[in-house]
């Protein structure tokens, strides 16, 4: 890994981090919409985490749910978030991310600023045209992605229970808790952080400390440009 987040590209890095967080939120809200057994209980677990926040937690969780329990009101809200609010926010953040990238320029593993050596037209001497080199490179990568994506969607949608959990084919039942409430595979690292904290400390409950640990595991990536104090840009 090289210092793609180092000065002067902090804004680009943070913009990418915000995009990642919004995509996680988009994935979570979309996961709840089928209203299957695992979807229901995943929403119950995640939203109830907010209830562990001292003083305001329970009121905040009730406000987000729109009810005292996960219900159709919650589903309608998450549907609006998934279809309207979050996509608009993602498009806006990606737009500003591209603007920042256009202004500052991309990085490279050697940490060399190619803008220091330009020709009479202002084009870096050590650069290559975006077309056809990068265009053909990206088209190839896009083709490989679409091949895998379409193979899963049309021929292997369950993904052996990893893409679509079999238990989620059952309708949501608030009176029957699944034997194991597991997150989608892309949330597994953060869910592991949440479950790893099983002790109370300084008057804070284990549930709250686990929530803080999970949130910190996500937020720490945004602070990388300021945490990395090494004088060497690349590794």
Mark where each language-model region is.
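Membrane-embedded and interfacial regions of multi-pass energy-transducing membrane proteins
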Residues: 1-235
């Amino acid at each position: 890994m090289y210092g793609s987040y180092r000065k002067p590209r902090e804004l680009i890095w943070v913009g990418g981090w915000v995009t990642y967080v919004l995509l996680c939120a988009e994935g979570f809200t979309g996961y709840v919409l089928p209203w299957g057994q695992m979807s229901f209980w995943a929403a119950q677990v995640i939203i109830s985490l907010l209830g562990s926040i001292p003083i305001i937690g329970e009121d905040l969780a009730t406000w987000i749910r729109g009810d005292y329990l996960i219900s159709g009101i919650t589903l309608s809200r998450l549907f609006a978030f998934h279809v309207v609010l979050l996509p608009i926010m993602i498009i806006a953040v990606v737009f500003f991310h591209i603007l920042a990238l256009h202004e500052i320029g991309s990085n490279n593993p050697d940490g060399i600023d190619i803008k220091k050596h330009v020709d009479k037209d202002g084009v870096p001497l050590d650069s290559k045209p975006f077309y056809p080199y990068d265009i053909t490179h990206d088209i190839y990568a896009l083709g490989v992605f679409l091949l895998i994506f379409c193979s899963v969607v049309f021929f292997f949608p369950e993904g052996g229970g990893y893409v679509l959990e079999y238990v989620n084919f059952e309708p949501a039942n608030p009176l029957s808790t699944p034997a194991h409430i597991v997150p989608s595979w892309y949330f597994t690292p953060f869910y592991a952080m949440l479950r790893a904290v099983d002790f109370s400390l300084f008057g804070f409950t284990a549930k709250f400390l686990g929530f803080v640990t999970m949130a910190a595991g996500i937020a720490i990536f945004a602070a990388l440009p300021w945490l990395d104090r090494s004088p060497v840009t690349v590794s």
